[in-house]
């Protein structure tokens, strides 16, 4: 874990000391950290407390290593998890990246249920990516080359099956995000992966019923 991640993790540890237990938690990687969930929810009339414990660049190994400050310590009544896209890489996993990712997702759910048996767990589908934006560079394309519609669909099918097997909820918020090639719409993203707030507003519309339930 690099220095910036360590700093964010330490801040979360301090915040967890004063956090109210039993509230709603959003946690995961950058796609969760960058989700302005608290502002959007409040502007839509949601009054409950929502915590965000996302950390940019986090993979599932790191999440498991630090699952207490990122999830368990808050003892949430509901947790929305979006983690795993940073495992979609040939380094260090090679052609075993998919098996590694799905095995760790299972571990995350199992560890959460073992410690927090009454917490409602919502596993979120990976968002679409776009590898065909005109401003992308060879470096950025190489970084995200495995995030094809086919690979993302494969991951999301696996996430849904894992959630069902473990008695959790699976949420796919992607209907309003994709173009006719099943890629992220260009107006939603600045690098092909990370989202502008206009995309997160659509994500919120899809998950709001689960947030209010």
What is each of the regions a protein language model found here?
Residues 63, 187-213:
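Histidine-centered active-site loop/cap adjacent to the catalytic His
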Residues 96-101, 140-151, 191, 195:
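Alpha-helix N-cap and loop-to-helix initiation/capping positions
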Residues 45-49, 135-145, 183-190:
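Short glycine/proline- and charge-enriched loop/turn segments
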Residues 116-120:
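A short helix->loop->beta-strand "cap" motif at the edges of active sites that frequently abuts
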Residues 105-110, 156:
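Generic structural signal for well-ordered alpha-helices
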Residues 2-103, 107:
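Conserved SGNH/GDSL esterase-like catalytic core that processes O-acyl groups on lipids
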Residues 88-90, 130-135, 178-184:
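Short acidic/His/Gly/Ser-rich catalytic and metal-binding motifs that mark active-site loops
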Residues 131-172:
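Substrate-gating cap/lid alpha-helix
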């Amino acid at each position: 874990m690099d220095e910036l991640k360590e700093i964010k993790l330490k801040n979360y540890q301090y915040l967890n000391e004063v956090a109210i237990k039993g509230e709603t938690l959003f946690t995961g990687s950058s796609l969760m950290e960058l989700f302005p969930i608290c502002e959007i929810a409040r502007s839509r009339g949601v009054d409950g407390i929502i915590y965000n414990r996302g950390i940019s660049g986090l993979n599932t190994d790191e999440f498991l290593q630090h699952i207490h400050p990122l999830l368990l310590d808050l003892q949430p009544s509901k947790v929305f998890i979006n983690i795993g896209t940073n495992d979609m890489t040939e380094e260090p996993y090679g052609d075993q990246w998919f098996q590694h990712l799905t095995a760790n997702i299972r571990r995350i759910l199992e560890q959460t249920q073992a410690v927090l048996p009454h917490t409602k767990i919502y596993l979120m589908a990976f968002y679409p990516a776009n590898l065909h934006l005109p401003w992308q560079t060879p470096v950025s394309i190489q970084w995200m080359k495995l995030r094809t519609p086919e690979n993302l669909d494969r991951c999301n099918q696996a996430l849904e099956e894992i959630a069902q097997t473990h008695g959790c909820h699976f949420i796919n918020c992607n209907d309003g995000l994709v173009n006719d090639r099943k890629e992220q719409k260009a107006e939603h993203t600045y690098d092909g992966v990370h989202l502008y707030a206009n995309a997160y507003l659509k994500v919120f519309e899809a998950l709001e019923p689960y947030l209010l339930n």
